[in-house]
Structure formats: structure tokens, C-alpha cells
């Protein structure tokens, strides 16, 4: 369980202790196996929250816990947290550390001190999950940005985390590659019980998640299912967000008399499953 209890966080710059809080008295919990999308405009606090959950940052006040372990701890507890919580950043170059694909994926398991046979097993498994077998010996510098992001995710998955944090990992890659990556991690959540926390500003990416958290000015503004969140289009627009295009289309058709359609449509498949017929 990831738990955030009354957490406030401020970035101190140049020694100033009175910086405006990036997060203010945030409370939430994420149980094992849950898929959660966190959305919000730039500066809403969503990436700060991710870094707190991964113990990269420590709260200014309040408490963040991973399976009961405090993220402001040190030593063995902190080491355990960083094994259990994997994070993938927006720019893969920020976390790729080796010169070849296979060496980068091996980096995490090797630092866990695992036997060689288990390291090899994890490498092969992670490469298969992300379709990277053909690129094993390729130099990182020769990869596209999308391929680099696949390697970054594979490296995190090779650590076999319980919680996978995706901090806007699709911003720099194509829609096709983004869809494949999200399908892979969503499938892993279903098959292995990994919690996936996906931070994004692309509304169409969150429709398949069980839960959506909306951040605004360091606060949790909404926390509900995608259907319930996107039913509140006016409130989202008031904080600089919007609903997916397919949701807009479904609502427009519903308003024009296509009564078989649900009021909130989340996918093209839903449109296909509800043939339009007007009153």
C-alpha cells in the first residue's frame, strides 16, 4: 500500500524556507494491484507527488509510507522502498546509464546482488515484455527516443517492483509507441498485481485506468473513476483540463438524440458497441 498522510512539500531555493508549497496537505492511498492515473496542468504537483512516492523527495511535513515503511527513513528501509517502487521519467536519457541495451537493463538487477542466473532471467524477461530482443547489443545512443523509453521501462521492470510510477513517459514518443507501452504495463498489472501510477496530461491515456486523481495547485481536486471524472467536464475545464475527444463526440451525439449511447463514452469500442439510433 502506498499511503500519503497530510503531506505538504515545498521546494526550497537559495536557502529560502518560505517557498510556496508544491503540495499542500495531500491525503491518498493506493492499494496493491490498482491502476491509477494522475492528471493536472503544469505546476499542479503531480510530478512532485511521484517523486515523494518514490522516496526521491521527502515531505516537508506529513508522512509518506510504502508498505508501512516511511520514505523519510534511511538505511535498509530506504533501500527496500527503492526496490519496491520503480519510476520512469519523461526523458529516458535521464535514467539510462549504460552504453548498450542489455547492459542498461542488467544494471538494476546487478545492483541487487542477485545470482547471475537470476539476473539473466530478468533481463530476458524484461526484453521480451518490451520487444527488445533484437536490440540487445545495440548502443543506446543509436536508439530512437521511443526505443530508449522502452529500455528505461524494461530496466525498471527487471527490478520487479511492486509499484510502477510513470512520470509523463509518453510526452516525447509517438502515439503508437505510447499505446504499446501503456498496454504492456496495464497487462502486467493484471497478470502480476503490480500497481501502476501513470502521471500524464494526455486525457485519452487515462480512460483504461481504474481510478483517476486530478491535481490542482498542490491539492487533490478529484479522485474517482474515469467515467465519473469525465462527467464533470465543466469543472475540468475550469482548471485547464479537458475530456478526451471520443468523450466529447459521445456527449454531442447523446445531446442530439442518440439515446442508446451512455452519457460518458471513454473509447471508440464503446461507440461501436452502442449503435446510434435517435429518438
Per-region residue spans from a language model:
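Conserved ABC ATPase signature
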Residues: 139-143, 147
Amino acid at each position: 500500500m502506498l499511503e500519503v498522510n497530510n503531506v505538504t512539500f515545498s521546494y526550497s531555493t537559495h536557502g529560502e524556507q518560505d517557498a510556496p508549497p508544491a503540495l499542500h496537505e495531500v491525503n491518498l492511498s493506493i492499494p496493491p494491484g490498482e491502476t491509477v492515473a494522475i492528471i493536472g496542468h503544469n505546476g499542479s504537483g503531480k510530478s512532485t507527488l511521484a517523486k515523494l512516492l518514490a522516496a526521491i523527495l521527502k515531505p516537508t511535513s506529513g508522512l509518506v509510507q510504502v508498505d508501512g515503511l516511511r520514505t523519510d527513513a534511511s538505511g535498509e528501509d530506504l533501500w527496500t522502498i527503492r526496490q519496491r517502487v520503480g519510476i520512469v521519467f519523461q526523458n529516458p536519457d535521464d535514467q539510462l546509464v549504460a552504453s548498450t541495451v542489455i547492459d542498461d537493463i542488467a544494471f538494476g538487477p546487478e545492483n541487487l546482488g542477485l545470482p547471475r542466473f537470476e539476473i539473466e532471467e530478468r533481463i530476458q524477461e524484461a526484453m521480451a515484455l518490451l520487444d527488445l530482443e533484437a536490440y540487445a547489443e545495440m548502443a543506446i545512443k543509436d536508439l530512437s527516443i521511443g526505443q530508449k523509453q522502452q529500455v528505461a521501462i524494461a530496466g525498471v521492470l527487471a527490478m520487479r517492483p511492486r509499484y510502477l510510477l510513470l512520470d509523463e513517459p509518453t510526452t516525447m514518443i509517438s502515439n503508437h509507441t505510447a499505446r504499446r507501452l501503456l498496454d504492456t504495463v496495464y497487462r502486467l498489472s493484471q497478470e502480476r498485481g503490480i500497481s501502476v501510477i501513470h502521471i500524464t496530461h494526455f486525457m485519452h491515456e487515462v480512460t483504461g485506468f481504474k481510478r483517476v486523481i486530478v491535481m490542482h495547485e498542490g491539492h487533490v481536486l478529484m479522485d474517482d473513476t474515469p467515467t465519473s471524472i469525465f462527467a464533470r467536464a465543466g469543472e475540468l475545464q475550469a482548471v485547464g483540463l479537458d475530456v478526451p475527444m471520443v468523450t466529447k463526440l459521445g456527449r454531442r451525439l447523446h445531446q442530439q438524440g442518440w439515446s442508446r449511447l451512455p452519457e460518458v463514452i471513454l473509447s471508440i469500442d464503446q461507440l461501436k458497441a452502442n449503435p446510434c439510433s435517435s429518438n
